[in-house]
A protein has these predicted regions:
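Extended catalytic cores of very large enzyme megasubunits
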Residues: 1-107
Length: 107
């Protein structure tokens, strides 16, 4: 990753210390993100295979997930998706249920 890339990573995606200083390099972010996402695999061998493969893919920048994933993976209640699609029924009850669902998603 080049100098400009390092600056972008530090400013936008790295975890910060109490003073707002970046505490991660690109390699650290990759390990944090892949470590978090790989927990979806229940089987430890599958998890290890995914971790190894995905780490290589991300380090080579063949695939880089979206910003919410880079920023929030590994944090408590970290939201990894950028958007959600919910059906909104055409009634007051349905609209209010939708508002409640949206609030729960974003809490």
């Amino acid at each position: 990753i080049g100098l400009n890339g390092q600056k972008v990573v530090s400013k936008r995606y790295s975890l910060k210390d109490a003073n707002g200083n970046a505490i991660e390099q690109w390699e650290d972010i990759v390990r944090r993100v892949v470590g978090h996402v790989s927990t979806a695999e229940r089987d430890s061998q599958a998890r290890d295979r995914f971790y190894g493969a995905m780490t290589g893919v991300m380090l080579n920048r063949e695939f880089v997930p979206n910003t919410p994933c880079l920023v929030n993976a590994g944090k408590p209640n970290g939201q990894l998706a950028a958007c959600f699609v919910l059906k909104v029924p055409d009634s007051i009850e349905g609209i209010m249920h939708h508002a409640q669902s949206a609030a729960i998603i974003h809490q």
